[in-house]
A protein has these predicted regions:
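Conserved anchor residues at repeat-unit boundaries in beta-strand-based tandem repeats, strongest
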Residues: 36-47, 59-70, 82-93, 105-115, ...
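Bacterial N-terminal signal peptides that target proteins for export
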Residues: 1-8
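Compositionally biased, proline/threonine/alanine/serine-rich low-complexity intrinsically disordered stretches
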Residues: 463-495
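Extracellular beta-strand solenoid repeats
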Residues: 51, 74, 97, 120, ...
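Leucine-rich solenoid repeat scaffolds
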Residues: 27, 433-472
Length: 495
């Protein structure tokens, strides 16, 4: 009985060893789908190590577990990709590396046959990504480096840059802030290699919204921006101390704005295309104030300026210069109204002095020049020609004393040929020099007497003829007295 049991036991052991030996044998098996397996089996299932090939070119070599690809192995895919690493349930699972046909690689964790978890991907174009993946897409925290020098270090969502990030650009610029759908969006800061810094809001990858822009030269802008350009309400503080606060359009001052210079200059008003244009008010460093129209940064059109001493000018301006028609009132009470050129009286105009003197007529380069009428404080009036501020040429004066002269003038004085009517009725017609009878002339006295001859310094010095009216004989010495009367009656004709 005992011998029989030993025999049965020995037989069982032999059969078991035979089966084990059979499981360890490398067997080649072809399946209905055309697949071919070459490797070991256990209990009729692929188990251990084996190679499996499909007609489409797929090939797997590695560990099997009861008919399942599981463990370490190498898979070659029809598209030329090669995966080497861990498997489970016939798929890459755990740590593994795949090399794609184009040369790109991924090494890291896999889940359910997909690139999911932490890993490093190097793409055929040289781009390198290290970080989190989900379903073969960048997802979570990761760093992408481009051969050009572009580096993105931040969060990703399903392959898209999204969330907080730090981006370094090929030129050395650095952005730190929010990213949405691959573009800079929300709050962020950009620092450029040349020193430019922008801190503020972004939209669609562009500077857009409210922010602070610091230029390399030290100028600082705070306010609204659009598409990277100043647009809307804002304030610029310049490195030299100047300040502009107001509206911008397309990166230039436009609309209403105030500019304050470090030197005390201040402008408040309208702007266009970066220049002072339209209505506005300027206060100059010396205290002068201009209010009116501007064009091209200069007073142009109608405007009024008030100077520190109280003087004013109101009228036309051209390119920052008083030119055209206007009215000037000076601190000493003098008033001029008329034409101007290059800030000087020019053309037709009227000048009135506080003492009552008034000139109306032509002007040139700030002086009375041409035809005009001068009225003096005592009521005297001159009508005629002026040259460089003086009576010169043909003119007539009527004095308050009753004296009247019509003739030529030189350097403000009666000089040349003319006719003088004296208050006592005497009339002289002839030559004058420096306001006095000088040269050839005829005096017709109110008495009817007429004398012709040479005159010197206002007196008759060489009588050529004399006509006496039919009157009683004159007293002895009367002729001399008449000459004296003539000299005394002559006025001092001045401006």
């Amino acid at each position: 009985m005992i011998r029989r049991k030993l025999t049965i036991t020995a037989l069982a052991v032999l059969l078991s060893q035979a089966a084990l030996a059979q499981d360890r044998d490398v067997v080649t098996k072809e399946y209905d789908d055309g697949g071919v397996y070459e490797g070991t089996f256990r209990n009729g299932l692929q188990h251990g190590e084996g190679t499996y090939r499909l007609p489409n070119g797929y090939e797997y070599t590695g560990d099997w577990d009861e008919g399942e690809i599981k463990g370490q192995g190498v898979a070659r895919f029809p598209n030329g990709s090669v995966y080497e690493g861990q498997f489970a349930q016939g798929k890459p699972e755990g740590m593994g590396k795949i090399t794609f046909a184009d040369g790109g690689t991924y090494e890291g964790t896999w889940r359910d046959g997909k690139i999911t978890g932490e890993g490093v991907a190097v793409y055929a174009n040289g781009v390198r990504y290290e970080g989190s993946f989900r379903n073969a897409l960048h997802h979570g925290q990761g760093v992408m480096t481009n051969p050009s020098g572009y580096v993105y270090d931040g969060t990703w969502v399903n392959g898209t840059k999204e969330g907080e990030a730090s981006i370094t650009y090929p030129d050395g610029s650095v952005y730190e802030g929010k990213v949405q759908e691959g573009e800079r969006e929300g709050r962020g800061t950009l620092t450029m290699p040349d020193g430019l810094v922008y801190e503020g809001t972004w939209h669609d990858g562009q500077i857009d919204g409210i922010g602070t822009l610091t230029q390399p030269n030290g100028d600082v802008y705070e306010g609204a921006l659009s598409q990277g350009r100043r647009d809307g309400q804002g304030k610029v503080t310049y490195a030299n101390g100047d300040v502009y606060e107001g509206e911008f359009v397309d990166d230039r001052r436009e609309g209403q704005g105030t500019f304050i210079g470090a030197d005390g200059y201040r402008y408040e008003g309208q702007w266009e295309a970066g220049q002072i244009e339209g209505q506005g008010t300027v206060t100059y460093p010396d205290g002068s104030v201009y209010e009116g129209e501007f064009s091209g940064d200069l007073a142009n059109g109608e405007g009024k300026i008030t100077y520190p001493d109280g003087s004013t000018y109101e009228g036309d301006w051209v390119d920052g210069v008083i030119e055209g028609q206007g009215r000037a009132v000076y601190a000493n009470g003098l008033v001029y109204e008329g034409g101007f050129r290059n800030a000087r009286n020019h053309g037709q105009g009227v000048m009135t002095y506080p003492d009552g003197y008034r000139y109306e007529g032509e002007w040139q380069d700030g002086q009375r020049h041409g035809q005009g009428r001068a009225t003096y404080p005592d009521g005297s009036e001159y009508v005629g020609s002026f040259v460089e501020g003086q009576r010169e040429g043909e003119g007539e004066i009527a004095m308050a004393s009753g004296f009247r002269y019509r003739g030529t003038w030189e350097d403000g004085e009666m000089s040349g040929a003319g006719v003088a009517n004296y208050a006592n009725g005497d009339v002289y017609e002839g030559e004058f020099v420096d306001g006095k009878r000088e040269g050839q002339g005829t005096m017709r006295y109110a008495s009817g007497e007429e004398v012709t001859g040479e005159w010197t310094n206002g007196a008759l010095t060489d009588r050529e003829s004399m006509t006496t009216p039919e009157t009683p004989e004159a007293p002895e010495g009367g002729e001399g007295e008449a000459d004296t009367a003539e000299a005394e009656a002559e006025p001092a004709a001045t401006d």
